């Protein structure tokens, strides 16, 4: 039920006939460039994360100022 070497060769020939070798070469180079760009981006991201110092945690605003800004409301239910 699996694919044999003959099946894969026939499939490859059909793909080459449909798309042509130039188009397949362009697709391959575009895909390779995308993978290379992704790998470079991952390297830059990890380098920046290692170089950046850990930020000190900021204190949360006091509850007194939060209480002044809070609006107290009551929910009404439908009868």
UniProtKB/Swiss-Prot annotation:
Coiled coil location: none
Membrane-crossing segments per the record: 1-21
Gene3D superfamilies reported in the protein's UniProt record: 1.20.5.3310
UniProt record, GO biological process: protein transport by the Tat complex
Biased composition annotated in UniProt, kind: Low complexity: 51-63
Lineage: superkingdom: Bacteria
Keywords, comma-separated and alphabetical: Cell inner membrane, Cell membrane, Membrane, Protein transport, Translocation, Transmembrane, Transmembrane helix, Transport
GO cellular component: TAT protein transport complex
Main location: membrane
InterPro entries on file: TatA/B/E, TatA/E
Localization of this protein: Cell inner membrane
GO molecular function: protein transmembrane transporter activity
Membrane-related topology note: Single-pass membrane protein
Location of region: Disordered: 43-63
Subunit structure: The Tat system comprises two distinct complexes: a TatABC complex, containing multiple copies of TatA, TatB and TatC subunits, and a separate TatA complex, containing only TatA subunits. Substrates initially bind to the TatABC complex, which probably triggers association of the separate TatA complex to form the active translocon.
General function of this protein: Part of the twin-arginine translocation (Tat) system that transports large folded proteins containing a characteristic twin-arginine motif in their signal peptide across membranes. TatA could form the protein-conducting channel of the Tat system.
Similarity-based family: Belongs to the TatA/E family.
HAMAP family assigned: TatA_E
This protein's name: Sec-independent protein translocase protein TatA
Source organism (scientific name): Albidiferax ferrireducens (strain ATCC BAA-621 / DSM 15236 / T118) (Rhodoferax ferrireducens)
